Structure formats: structure tokens, C-alpha cells
Amino acid sequence: MKKHAKRKRDSAQPKLWLFPAVLVLLLANAAPSHAQNLPRMSDGKPDFSGIFTQPSTVNPSGPRGTLIFNADKMAPLKPGAESLLYEPRNGDPRHDEPRAMCLPAGFPDGMLYILPIQIIQNPKYIAIIPELQRAARIIPTDGRPHRTGLEPSYYGDSVGKWEGDTLVVDSVNFKRWILDDYHYTDPTKTRWHSDALHTIERLKWEGNKLSYQITIDDPKIFTRSFSQDFELTLRPDWDQLGLLEYVCEENNRCAGGKCRASDGQ
């Protein structure tokens, strides 16, 4: 009887030696990882194609999200550089609010405006197209070097490369231009970047959102580089409608002439 009772107690005890094997089976049958679930192109790289809401800051604090140079994010200025960053309004809207006069928004302002963004991609290039002015940035993603001998431009020269599932876009050769929407918050000043601006963008999937980090390096103005994180939400329901037409010149009330502030669009 004692032996029989002991066998019953043994059979009631948990089989601890089975736990590692069960754990292995559970892990093997678990859902695929986030990396495996990413939309991918034919070459295996993440596919960012789609229409997204405008970038918004992650856990924002301070002014509106398009101001990437918020006080809590901006690096310290170099001595004497305040006059390069801040320019007083002079009454000429081509200087004070160039976008309202159909001039290019430039970068990074054009990327961070309050309109949708479409991304079109193939294994060689990615096209980032803001609805604002339809100013497409067509960026090679094969890791090639920057082009040489180009005139500085509003959107710079951009090249991309992959670091795992993150696309890294490096941009240089900018024309000195207005920086962001600071002129909407300060009636006396605008903010500008220098022609030494260098930006690095990092894009990667985080669920149905596209994580977007921009790093600003402007050695004529700031003592160091600094970054800010944004996110873009994928909107498949916007695919059928697409980006809307953005026409500025058709309503330009002073084309080719001398403009006044009241002539802004």
C-alpha cells in the first residue's frame, strides 16, 4: 500500500523536466517577429510606400510640431551666430514668408508641414513627396556618395543607405534659406539655416507608424548637432484619393513684380 501511495504522489507532481521542451515548442510556434511582419520589397528591404499623415512630434512639448528648433531641442548657438539664425522681418514677403509667394518651402520645412506625405519606392530609389508644393525628393538608396559640382539648392543633395531595416538619408549642399514655421509665432523675426546645413534622416517602421528622426548639423550656427523624433501614420484609406493638387502660382498676385506683405497668398 505504501508503494502504491508513493506512486500516486509521484504522478501528481509536475514534470519539471518537461518545462524546457514545452517552452521551446511555444517559442517555435509563436507569432512572427515585428521584423518578419514588415512590408518588404523584392530585395527584402522594408517598403515604406503609402500615404502618411504629416509628421507629428513624439510626446510633444512646446510649440507646434513643425518647429524642430524648439528651445528644449535646439543645440546651443555659437557666439555671434544669433544673427545667422534669426533674421528680422523686412517687409518683403519674399524674405519674410517666401512660401506664401510661391517660392520653395525648402528643407526641412517642406517635410514637416501640416499636409500629407506620399512615399513611392523601388529597390534603387525612394521618392518622398509632400503634398505641399509637390516638391518630390528622389533619393538613391544604394549608398552612393554625394554628387559634386552642383549649385546649392533649396532641398540639398540627398543620398540614402540601409542600416538593417532603417533607411538613413544624408543631405548636404543647401542654399541658405528659411528654416521652419517660426515666423508664424514671432511677428518680428524669421529663422534661417546656413549654407553649411547637414541633415541626417532615419526612417523605420514602428507598427503602422513610420518613425522619422531628423538630425541637424549646422556648424556655422550651432555648437553641436541635435535631433528630434517624429512619427508619420500610414493612411491606406487615402490611397484612392491620393495627394491633392497644390497650385500656388495660379493665385500669385504679384508675379514678376515688387510684392507687398498684403500680396501673400
Regions found by a protein language model. Name each.
Residues 2-3, 32-265:
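PEST-like low-complexity, intrinsically disordered acidic/proline/serine-rich tracts
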Residues 1-16:
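N-terminal secretory signal peptides that target proteins for export/translocation
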Residues 17-30:
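Bacterial N-terminal signal peptides
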Residues 9, 30-32:
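A composition/secondary-structure signal for short, hydrophobic, low-basic-content segments
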